[in-house]
UniProtKB/Swiss-Prot annotation:
It is found in: Cell inner membrane. The complex is composed of two ATP-binding proteins (MetN), two transmembrane proteins (MetI) and a solute-binding protein (MetQ). Its main location: membrane. It comes from Paraburkholderia xenovorans (strain LB400). GO terms for molecular function: ABC-type D-methionine transporter activity; ATP binding; ATP hydrolysis activity. The gene is metN2. ATP binds at residues 69-76. GO terms for cellular component: plasma membrane. This is Methionine import ATP-binding protein MetN 2.
């Protein structure tokens, strides 16, 4: 697979193009800064609606930064501020050290040549071949034909479509169309790649392949990627950092492993629900509240969570031994442990037997279970008993 660093940077041959972003900023400064950004839209009757409010974020150079939220949360508006398709009503958006809102039309053209865009619905020209679709931005910029051909060939190899260079979009699968879109976005050697729900129109298998391609491109080219999505699985697979947006405000942000392992906001927990190991219906129907417990022998269900904050791996064997109070049975009935960015995290539902005797009540044994479980996990609570 080709490395674009091996190909000449043909964008320099195009007329009226700006100096590289490195002249405006340093490699240690964020690629994108949202500084207390607000965006207000007014309808035809002059009624104002706040799409974004008080958004402050830093996107580090070379990272994959994910923005997630439900439909209408403000994700697309936030993304459009980066390339100047929208201007902030308040605050500032800085890209490579330049305030986007202060640029004139010529400055915006220059900015957009350093920012690639990948769309949800591909936006390919049906009457042009794969090669022609990818080459279009360079052709418009006046780059020599020989240079265009060489660059397009390198990109086709990078995205795995060399055999499709003369095919038309109608003959391509959804995943192949998106690969063309990615190649086209990279043809001007951008510093930043914006992805607007780039996988939401794809099947799960194709989605995985496109996400792997985006991560490969990010690592090969040290390219800053900003993507928006409503799918937590996309964030989990490809992002380094995530920001959760709800009703126009960023309610939570941080490394993906930390946000997934210990979500702090209800909106984040709601979005994560598709990935969380909830109790199966048959088990949930059998669980009784703890205050109803009367028998001297019961199976207590504990919700045991690992956030990934600890350097050590979860010691499940030690946990099982610790919960065997008075020799009672212990079993893991549901859940699992996953790894995100090198951090082991997850949720387990553990069944532990308690039996009252002359020396200890059921309530005392439950208290012992909780105390012991908390030595091994970050969060533990009693779900009830069966």
């Amino acid at each position: 697979m080709a490395n674009l660093f091996d190909a000449p940077q043909f964008i320099e041959d195009a007329p009226s193009l700006a100096v590289n972003a490195e002249s405006h900023t340093t490699a240690t400064q964020p690629a994108v800064i949202f500084d207390d950004v607000g965006k207000v839209f007014a309808n035809t009757r002059g009624v104002a609606t706040a799409a974004l409010a008080n958004v402050t974020l830093n996107v580090a150079r070379g990272e994959v930064f994910g923005i997630i939220g439900r439909s209408g949360a403000g994700k697309s508006t936030l993304l459009r501020l980066v390339n100047g398709l929208e201007k902030p009503s308040s605050g500032a958006v800085r890209v490579n050290g330049v305030s986007v809102g202060e640029l004139d039309e010529r400055g915006l053209v220059t900015l957009r040549r350093r920012i690639g865009m990948v769309f949800q619905h591909f936006n390919l020209l049906s009457a042009k071949t794969v090669r022609e679709n990818i080459a279009l931005p360079l052709k418009i910029a006046g780059v020599p034909k020989a240079a265009i051909e060489k660059k397009v060939d390198a990109l086709l190899e990078l995205v795995g479509l060399s055999a499709k260079r003369d095919a038309y979009p109608a003959s391509l699968s959804g995943g192949q169309k998106q690969r063309v879109g990615i190649a086209r976005a990279l043809v001007t050697d951008p510093d930043i790649l914006l992805c607007d729900e780039a996988t939401s129109a794809l099947d799960p298998e194709t989605t995985q392949a496109i996400l792997a391609l985006l991560r490969d491109i990010n690592q090969r080219l040290n390219l800053t990627v900003v993507l928006i999505t409503h799918e937590m699985q996309v964030i989990r697979e490809v992002c380094d950092t995530v920001a959760v947006i709800e009703r126009g405000e960023v309610v939570e942000t941080g490394p993906v492993w930390r946000v997934f392992g210990d979500p702090q906001h209800d909106a984040t927990r709601a979005l994560l629900r598709t990935l969380v190991h909830d109790l199966p219906t048959d088990l949930a129907e059998r669980v009784k509240p703890l205050h109803d417990i009367a028998q001297a022998d019961a199976q207590i269900l504990l919700d045991v969570r690992f956030t990934g904050a600890d350097a050590r791996e979860p010691d499940l064997g030690g946990l099982a031994s610790a919960l065997s109070v008075e020799g009672g049975r212990v079993s893991f009935v549901h859940g699992g442990i996953d790894r995100i960015q090198g951090h082991a995290q997850g949720r387990l539902v553990v069944s532990a037997q308690v039996r009252a005797n002359a020396d200890s009540t059921v309530q005392a044994q439950i208290a012992t279970l909780l105390e012991r479980a908390r030595r091994y996990a970050n969060h533990v609570e009693v779900l009830g008993y069966v």
